[in-house]
Amino acid sequence: MSQVPCYTIINSPDLEVPNEMQLKQDLEKGDTNHKIETLKKVIKLLLNGERYPGLIMTIIRFVLPVQDHTIKKLLLIFWEIVPKTSGDGKLLQEMILVCDAYRKDLQHPNEFLRGSTLRFLCKLKEPELLEPLMPAIRACLDHRHSYVRRNAVLAIFTIYKNFDWLVPDGPELIANFLDTQQDMSCKRNAFLMLLHADQERALNYLASCIDQVHSFGDILQLVIVELIYKVCHANPAERSRFIRCIYNLLNSSSNAVRYESAGTLITLSLAPTAIKAAASCYIELIVKESDNNVKLIVLDRLIAMKENENMEKVMQDLVMDVLRVLAAPDIEVRRKALALAMDLVYSRNIGEMVLVLKKEVAKTHNVEHEDTGKYRQLLVRTLHTCSIKFPDVAATVIPVLVEFLSDTNELAAADVLIFIREAIQKFPALSGLIIEHLIEAFPQIKSSKIHRAAVWILGEYVEGPQIIEVIDAIQQTLGDVPMVEAEQRRLSGDPTEEQSQQQGSATGGVSGDGSSSTTTSTSNAINKVTSDGTYATQSAYSLAPVAKVEKRPPLRQYLMDGDFFIGAALSATLTKLALRYVELQPDSSAQNRLTTRVMLIMSSILHLGKSGFPSKPITNDDTDRIFICLRTLSERTPEAVSVFMHYCREALGKMLDAQHDEDQRVLKEKQRATAKVQPDDPVLFAQLSNGRDNQLGENVFESSLNQALAGTKTAQLSDISSPNNKLNKVTQLTGFSDPVYAEAYVNVNQYDIVLDVLIVNQTNDTLQNCTLELATLGDLKLVERPHPVVLAPHDFCNIKANVKVSSTENGIIFGNIVYDTALNTNVVVLNTIHIDIMDYIIPASCTDTEFRQMWQDFEWENKVTVNTSFTDLHEYLRHLLKSTNMKCLTPEKALSGQCGFMAANMYAKSIFGENALANLSIEKPVDDPDSKVTGHIRIRAKSQGMALSLGDKISSSQKQSVQAA
C-alpha cells in the first residue's frame, strides 16, 4: 500500500453508473468536448473503485492522439490512477504504446506540455515505463524554458530516489547543471536534489558561492538554510564554517528565510550575540508581519527560547523591543507579548516597562475597539504583577490604575480593586496613598459591583482622621438622609437639601428687594418666531409643566434599582469605621455623634427597602446583615467587635498566602516538568544516536516527521509508556459465531479518528464485494467510504476509515458489513462504537473573575445529581477530576479538613477551544461516617452538546463506581 499514491476523492451524485460499452462509444465517436466530459466521468469512476480494463485500448486509439491541451491534462490524471499491471503483477502490454506517447510529449514544442509530462513522471512507480524515457528526460535539462528545466530536475530527483540504477550519474549530472544555471527556481530544485542525494556536492557548491548567498532568491535560500541545519546537526564541527552565512541570511528580504535562519542560528550557537540576533529577528518579524497567525507562531518561538535559562538572560535586555508588539490590534498577540515581557523584565528595566504600559493605558481611553475592554483588563493585570513583583514601582502605578475605577468596563475596574486590595495588604507603607486616591475616585465609580469592593477596602484600611473623610464621601454619594423623606419630597416637587444648596450657590448674590423674581420671570420668557416672520414673546408661566428627570447620587440609585446588597456592604463598612473611630476618639460625645450618624444611614436604608419606592424590596438576607451591624454598634460585644475589626483582614491575609503558595506550587511543577533527564532515568534508543552531550538537541525535521507518522505527540508518548495501550482500545464489532468477524482499533488523533478494522472470513466460501458500511451520530463525519474487498475462505484483511471530528460531543459510529456469496447478499450488523469526549478535553486554569464571567455568559446548564458509593468528600472530588479531565480551581487549603460539606469550581477546555465549567456542591453528615456523599454538579458550557456530553460522562462514571462497590 505504501507504493500507491494518495488521491483526492471527488464526490459525484449517486446517478446510474454508465456501462463500459456506452463509455467506449462516447470516446470513439464523440467530438472533443464530448470526449473531455467522458474522460472526466471515467476518472471519477476509477477513483470510486470501478474497474474498466477494456477502456485502456480505446483511449490509446481514439483519445491519446488528440492534441487538445485539456485532454492532455486529463490523460495525465488518467494514466496516473489507472491500474498498469495485470493480476500477476506484470506490466500491461498496452502501456508500451502509452510509453511512446510519453516520449512524444517530452519532445513536444509546447513547454507547458513538456513540463506537465515531467511532473507526471515523478508519480510513476513502474521502472519499465521510465527506462525508455530517460534520454528524453535528460534532454529536457537543456530546454530553453525554465519551467521545463526545473520539472526535469524534479523528475530526475524522483527517479534517482526510487530507481537509482536508471540514472546512476544523477548527482553529477545535476551538479554540472547547477553550475551553469541562472534561473533561481531551477537552482533551487537542483540544490534540493543534491541536499538529499549527495550532500558533499551540495556543500562544495555552497562553499564556492557562500558570499553570494544573500543575492539568491528566497526559495533557494530556504533550501540552503535546511542544508546547513542538517549538516551542522550531523557534524557539529561544521558550525564555524557556515554560521556566518546564517548571520547574513538574517537580513534577507524574505520573512520566511529570516524566520528559518533565526531558528537555525539558535540551534547552532548559544553565544549571546547569536541569541540576541535571533530574538531581534523574531521581534522584527512580529512587528512587520500583518498576519496574526504568523505573529502568534513567532511569539511561541520566542517563548520557547525564554524557557532556556541561558537564552533568558540574554533576552532580558530585549524587553522594550518585545513591547513594540503591543502595536498589533489582536488581543491574543498582545496577551502573549505582555506575558513574555513580564517573564523577562527585571529590576533594571522595570521602570521603562511601566512607562510604556502607562502610555498604552492612555491610548485605550481614546480608542473604542471591540477588544479595548479586554486590553485594558490585560494592562491592569500586567501592572498589578509588576507592582507585586517589583514593589518600588507600585507608588507610580497606583494613580494610573485608580483612573480605571470610573471606567464603564467592570472587568478592568474589578481587576484594579483586586490589585489595590493586595497592594494595601502587602505594602502598608502605601496605604495612605492608596486611600487618598480611592476616596478621590469614589464619587466617579459607575458600577455597584465596583462600589461594593471599594467600600470594603475603605472600611478595612482607613484609619485616623481619614475616617470622617470617608464617611463624608459615602454620604455624598448616598444623598439626603433619611432617604424615604427625601424621595417623598422629590416626588412632591419640593426641593431637596441638595437642590436647595445648588440653587443657593447659583443665586447667592441676588438682593432681597424682589429683583430675584423679576430676573427669574425675565429669564423664563422665550422668544418665538411666528409664521409671518415677526417675533413673539411667550412666558414660561403659560407653558405646561414638563416632568424633569433628576439624577440621583450613585449609591442612592443602586438602592432605588433594588440592589440592597450594596446597602449591606455599606452598613458593614460604616460599622467598621465607627468602631475604629470609637477606639481612636476618647471624647464620648464625639463617639456618640458619629455612631448615631452611621446608624441613621443604616436605618434609612432599611426603611427605604420596605417603603415601596425601590423597584424591588430589600431581601431578608440584606435585612439581617444590616440588623447585625446595628446591634453590633449598639451593644459592642467583644466577640462581634473582633469579627469586624480583625477577622476580615486576617481572612484576606490567609487567602493571599494561599494564592501565593498555589502559585509557587504550580511554578515548581512546571520546573519539574521541564527538568532535564536524570542519570537514573531510562534512556530511549532514539536518544542514544544524538547523545546527551550534543548541544544541538533533537533534529527538528526528524521529530516533526515522526510526529506526523505517529499522530499526535500525546498519543505517541502514551503508546510508548504503555505497550498494551492499543490493545485496550480494541472494540469487538461482531460475534465469534458470525460468518464475518470484525474488530476495530480506535486511534483518536487531534481532529480525526482512524478506525483500523480487522475483518476475518470465518466461512469456507469466497466473499465478493465485502464492504464496510459506516454511519455516524453526533458531530462526526465520515471522510470517505471504504472500498469493497474480496476475501478468500478463512482470509482476513484490514480496512481503515477516517472520521472527522469538529466539536467536543459524544459521538456514535455504527454500521454493518455487506458481502456477496454464490447464492445471495448477506448483512452482518456491527456493534456501535462510542467516541469518548475525554479524548478531546484537557485541564485548564482561569482566574476567579473569568470563571464568574463565563458562568454568567454561558447559557447551557446541565445539573447532575450525585449518586455514588463514595463516603468521603475528598475521594469523590478526586474521582470526579480523574473521570472528567477537569482541573479544580478551588485552592487546596480551602478544601482541607472535614466539615460535612464541600463546594469546588472546576474548569477544562477542549482542543477546539470550547470551555467547560463545573460547580461541585456535595455534603454528608459529619456524625455518620458510613453515609454516602450526596449533592449535585452543575455544568455550564456555551454549546448544548458540550454540557450534555460532560454530564453523561459524569453519570456513567458514577454508575461504574456504584457497580464496583
UniProtKB/Swiss-Prot annotation:
Residues 513-523 have a biased composition (Low complexity). Coiled coil: none annotated. GO terms for molecular function: structural molecule activity. The keyword Glycoprotein does not apply. The keyword Ribonucleoprotein does not apply. InterPro entries: ARM-like, ARM-type_fold, Clathrin/coatomer_adapt-like_N, Coatomer_bsu_C, COPB1, COPB1_appendage_platform_dom. It is a peripheral membrane protein. One of its GO terms (cellular component) is Golgi membrane. GO terms for biological process: endoplasmic reticulum to Golgi vesicle-mediated transport; intra-Golgi vesicle-mediated transport; intracellular protein transport. It holds the Pfam family Coatomer_b_Cpla. HEAT repeats lie at residues 128-165, 237-273, 274-311, 313-350, 392-429. The coatomer is a cytosolic protein complex that binds to dilysine motifs and reversibly associates with Golgi non-clathrin-coated vesicles, which further mediate biosynthetic protein transport from the ER, via the Golgi up to the trans Golgi network. Coatomer complex is required for budding from Golgi membranes, and is essential for the retrograde Golgi-to-ER transport of dilysine-tagged proteins. Required for limiting lipid storage in lipid droplets. PANTHER family: COATOMER SUBUNIT BETA (PTHR10635:SF0). This is Coatomer subunit beta. It comes from Drosophila pseudoobscura pseudoobscura. The gene is betaCOP.
